[in-house]
Amino acid sequence: MTSRKRLVLSYCCLALLLAVLFALSLFWGSVALTPQAVLAALTGRGQDALSVGIITQLRLPRAVMAALLGAALSAAGYLLQTFFANPIAGPFVMGISSGAKLAVALVMVLFLNYGLLTSSAVLILAAFAGAMAAMAFVLAAARRVQRMSILVICGVMIGYICSAITEFVVAFAQDSSIVNLHNWSQGSFSGMTWGNVRTAALVVLPALAAAFCLAKPMAAYQMGEAYARSVGVDGRRFSRLLVLLSSLLAACVTAFAGPISFVGIAVPHLVKQLLGSARPLYVLPGCCLGGAAFCLLCDLIARSLFAPMELSISAVTAVFGAPVVIGLLLRRNREDVR
C-alpha cells in the first residue's frame, strides 16, 4: 500500500471511529434512548421533554467536550514530545497537568470559601498560570541535566508535589464544595454545559490552528536545532511557541475536566504507528481525530461500566494508555541494546 493510500485510509478509519463513538455517546447511558429518539431530539421534533433534555443538555455537550478536549490533550502531548525530543513526554508525565490542577484548586477553594462564583475564563487563566509555572520548573531542570530520563523523572516528581499540595488545599475547602473538588480532581467530563463548550472552543480551536501553522517548522525542528536554523527557523521563538501552545491546551483540558493521564502520550504514538509517518503535517490531524475518539471511548466506559456509578476518566485512560507507554519503553530499550 502506498503511503498516500495509507494516509487516506487511516484518516477515514479515524473519522469513522470518531463518528460511531460520538453517536454511541448520545444514545448509550443509564437511560437508554433509541436512535430515533436521538434524531428527533437533535432535529427539534422530539415530543418527550425528558429525552430532549437528556440529549441536548447533558449528553450532547458532554460528547462535544470529550471530543474537543481529547483532541487538545493529544495535540499538547505531541507538541511536548517534539519540544523535548522524547516520546514519553506529555502534559501529565511532565507535571503540567498537575500544576494546572493545583492553580485551579486554589482559585476554586478561594472563590467558594468567599461565596464567589468562578467563571470558565477565570479557571482557564488559573490553569494556564499553573501549567506555565510547572513548565518553568521542568525547563529549569532541563538546563541542569543531560539525560532525558532524568528530566522525565523530574517532571513526574513535580507532578507529585503539585498533587500533594492540591490535597492540602482541598482540605481547607468548605464541606459543600469538597465533593465537587474531589470529583473534578479525579478527572471527569460530567456536568459540561454549552457555555463550557463555547469557552473551550474559543481557546482550543485557535490553539490547534496555530499548531497546524507550525507543522513545517516542527518538521525541521525534529531534524535537529542546527538544521532548523539552517532553513530559517528561529529556535528560541519556535520553542516558546511550542511551550505556550502545549501549556494552553493542557490548561484548558484541566480547567474543565481535571487532570487526564496518558492521552497525550499514548495517542500520538498510536497515530504515528497507524499512519506510518512521523511528519507533523500528517500526525497533528491524526492526533486530533485519535484523541477525540479515545476520550469518547474512555468516557463511554467510565459512565457505563458500573452505571449509575461513574468512574474517573483518568482511571480508564490509564488502563488503556499505560500498556502503550510500557510497550514504547520496551521497544526503545531493545533499540538501545542493538
Stretches found by the model and what they are:
Residues 1-338:
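Alpha-helical transmembrane segments in inner-membrane proteins
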